Amino acid sequence: MQEKIELNQEVAKPLAEKHTPMMQQYLRIKADHPDTLLFYRMGDFYELFHDDAEKAARLLDITLTARGSSNGVPIRMAGIPFHSADQYLAKLVKLGESVAICEQIGDPAASKGPVERKVVRIVTPGTLTDASLLPDKSDTFLMAVHQQTTRRGVSKTGLAWLNLASGELRLMECEAAQLAREFERIRPAELLYADGIDLPAVACARTRLPEWHFDQDAGTRRLLEQLGVASLEPFGCAGLGAAIGAAGALLNYAATTQGQSLRHVRDIKVERESEFVGLDSATRRNLELTETLRGGESPTLFSLLDTCATAMGSRALRHWLHHPLRDPALPRARQQAIGVLIDHGIDDLRSALRKLADVERITSRLALLSARPRDLSSLRDTLRALPHVRACLQAEPDSSLLSLTVAELAVPQACLDLLISAVAEEPATVVRDGGVIARGYDAELDELRDISENCGQFLVDLESRERTRTGIANLRVEYNRVHGFYIEVTNGQADKVPDDYRRRQTLKNAERYITPELKAFEDKALSAQDRALAREKQLYDVLLQALLPHIGELQRVAGALARLDVLASLAERAQTLDWSCPERVGDNVIDIVQGRHPVVEGQLAAESVPFIANDCQLNEARKLLLITGPNMGGKSTFMRQTALIVLLACVGAYVPARRAVIGPVDRIFTRIGAADDLAGGRSTFMVEMTEAAAILHHATPASLVLMDEIGRGTSTFDGLALAWAIARHLLSHNRSHTLFATHYFELTQLPQEFPQAANVHLSAVEHGDGIVFLHAVQDGPASQSYGLQVAQLAGVPQPVIRAARKHLAWLEQQSADATPTPQLDLFAPPPHPDTSDDDEPVSIGKPVQVALLPEQAAVLDALSDLDPDSLTPRAALDALYRLKVLAGEVVDAA
C-alpha cells in the first residue's frame, strides 16, 4: 500500500501544475488515500471526484455530473449533503467500502487560496463507532490475523480482534486449520492481513497491510504504550508472539482511522480454545443460534431469548450464546443469579432497565471525543437512575454474581455531577445548533445568550429611558439590516437631541443617531449568536476532555448493566416458558427428561399447538442412539433440541426440560442436512463427508455428536456401508455421545454388535391413506418410513401416489417371492482372523469378464439409470429392491 501511495504522489506532482489550486489540493489528499472513497467537504456538501464520483454514483444511486475541466479533462463529480452523510456512509460500509472524511479546518474568510482541509477520520467496516452506522444488537469487530514460523519451524497463527465501539481487545492463537471456525465464531466485519497468508473464505471486508506492520517487537511496544504498563505478562500474553504482532497492526490501523489515540482500549483478554465449548460453522448454522438456515434473523434461539431491555444487553446475550463455557463454574453462577431473580420478582428491575441508554457505546464515543450532546444527556439520565437499579437488587444478596453486579453499579458521582452542571436537560442534536450547555455553567455564555435572546426587550427599555431623559415623546429605537441599530428623532424635535448622540443617517423628515451605549450593544448583539455558538463549541470540547478520566468507571458500569440485563431476560424467559435449572455433574452423562425444542415450541405456541416433549439418556453404557422413523416425524427436531439444551446449560441459562443433568462437554458437532457448495466446487456428498471427517478426527468422549442421514448422497450400498462404518467408529474410537438418525434400517442391527448403541424411533400411525405423526420418541426401531404418505402430504399428484403404491406392492411381492441369492453379509466380519482393524480390504478374488446374459444386461441398465446424488433414502431402498428382483432373474436364467 505504501508503494502505491508513493507512486500516486509522484504521478500527482507533474499533473498538479496543470490543475486548479482546489483540484491540486484534492489530488494531494486523494494520493494519501488511494484505496478509499474520499468525501471532500465543500460548504454544505461532501463532493466526490473522478473515479470516486463514478463509483459513488453507482453504489449510492446519486447523480453523476461533469462541471468545468481540470488539465483539459471534464471533472466528473457527485455530491451528498453533509447533514445526511450518515445514511450514505451506512450504505457504503454495508457494501464493504471505506470512506475518508475530509473536512474544512481553515476559515474561508481568512483563506487566500483553497480553504485548508484535512482527513479527520476514515470510516471502514471494522472501525465504526457512530450509532447511526452500527447495528444495535450485534458487535462489529476489526480483526487482524498473522502467521509466524518459529525457529523450530512450527507455524503459529495469531488473531487479535477489537470492538472499537466498546474498547474490548482480545487475542488468541490457533492452528491454521481452525481459522474458518474462529472466523465463524467471531464474525469480523473487516480483516487485516499481510501478503503470503493462506486465508479461508470469510464474508467480510479485507484490508492488506505490509508484512512489517505485524512485527512482534513493534506489537509488544504498541501494546505496552496502549495499556500504560511495563510488561504484558499479567495479561497472559506470554508466548503469543503471532497474536501480539497481529494486535500491533490492528491498534495502529484503528488509531489511524480515528485520527487519534484509542483511550478506551485499556485491557486485553486472552482467549484459549479450551475455554469454550467448540462449535464449528456447521454447528452454529444447523442449531440456528442467531441466524436461520436461510439467513434470517428470526426465528432463532437468540430471537426467542432476547427480551433484553437495552441494546448492550442484547449484544451480551448474543456473545454468551456463541461462547458456551466448558468450566461449569460461571454457568452455575449465572443460573443461581437467574433463580434468585425469579424468586424475588423481576418486573421492577426490567422496568428500570428499559429507561437506560447504551452506556457501552456512549463511553466509546466519549473516549474518541465524538460523543454528541444527546449522548451526554442520555448518559447523565442513566447515571441518575443507577441508585434505583441497585435498589431493585439490594434485597437479593443470595447470588455472588448479583452481589458483584451491585458493587459494579456504584454511581461515578464526579462524572454525574459534571454532566448535571454542564449539559442542558434537553440539548440540541448537534452542537452547532446551540442550546447544549446548561444555563449557569458559564457566565460568558449566559451573557451572550441573554443578549441574543433579550434584544427586543433591551430596545424597548432603552427607548423608554431615552424618551424620559430627552423629553422627546416620539423618539424611537429601531434596527435594520443596512444601518444596524439607531435612535430616530423627527426634525421638529432635533433641538432636544443630547450631545452624546452621533448622527448616523439623515432622512427627509428625521435624523437617525447612535449612542455609545447603543453602539456597544450593537457590537454585542450582532455577533452574540455567533459568539455564543463558538463559546458553546469551545465549552463542549473542554467538557469532553474533562470526562475522559471517567472512562474506566463508565466501562465498569456498562459491563454490569449488560450482564444484569441478560440475566433478567433469561429469568423472564425461564419463568414465562416454564424452563428448569439444569444440574451440572462430573459424570459423563446427558440425561434430559421431557425436553423440548425452544424455538419450535415457541412457533407452535403461536398457533396454539402443544409441543411433544421427549426424554434423552446418554451415558457410558448408552453412548449412541440410532434414531429411525418417518420423514417429518421429528428426528432432526429431537436431535437439535438435545444439542440446544446442552448448549444452554453451558451458557448458564435455564433449559426447556422438566429436568436435565449435564456432564462435561467439550464440543458439539452436527452433521444435519447438506447442500452443494457451488462456490467451492463441492457436491452435497462431498460436503457431507467433509463434515463427517471433521467429526471423526476431533470428537472426544466429552463431545456431543449429531449425525442425520449420513451417506444419503451416494449409491445405496456405498452410503449404507459408510453410515455403518462411521457409527461403528464413533462407538469404538471416539466414544462420543451420539444421536444418529438414519433411514437405513439395516443399521438397527448395530446394537447387536455394540451394546453401547440403542435403537429409538419417532412414532407415527396410519389413518386411512394418510399418516399421523406422534412425535414421541420410543424404544426400538421404526417399522417403516411412510414415504408415500409423506409424499402425499407434500402435494404429489394423486395419480403418482396411486402408481407408486401399486409399484411398491409389486416390489414387495417380488421381494418376498424371489429366491435368495448368495451374497456377502455386509455386517459379517472379514474372512481374516483379525477383525479389530478395518484397514485391510476383504479379498474376494479377481473379476473375470464374460459375455452378458439379457438378464444381466437388465441389471446394468437399471444401475446406469440411477442418479445416486438425487436419490432419497426411500427411493434408494426402492431401487435396491428392484435390483434384488433383477438379480434373482439373473440367478434363475443361469
Curated annotation (Swiss-Prot):
Keyword Transferase (UniProt): no
Chain residues that bind ATP: G629, P630, N631, M632, G633, G634, K635, S636
PROSITE patterns in the cross-refs: DNA_MISMATCH_REPAIR_2
UniProt keywords, alphabetically: ATP-binding, DNA damage, DNA repair, DNA-binding, Nucleotide-binding
Top-level division of the source organism's lineage: Bacteria
A cellular component term, taken from the record's GO annotations: cytosol
Chain residue ranges for the region called Disordered: 819-840
Known role: This protein is involved in the repair of mismatches in DNA. It is possible that it carries out the mismatch recognition step. This protein has a weak ATPase activity.
Protein name: DNA mismatch repair protein MutS
Pfam family, any one: MutS_III
GO molecular function per UniProt: ATP binding; ATP-dependent DNA damage sensor activity; damaged DNA binding; mismatched DNA binding
SUPFAM superfamilies to which the protein is assigned, alphabetical: DNA repair protein MutS, domain I, DNA repair protein MutS, domain II, DNA repair protein MutS, domain III, P-loop containing nucleoside triphosphate hydrolases
NCBIfam families linked to this entry: mutS1 (TIGR01070), PRK05399.1 (NF003810)
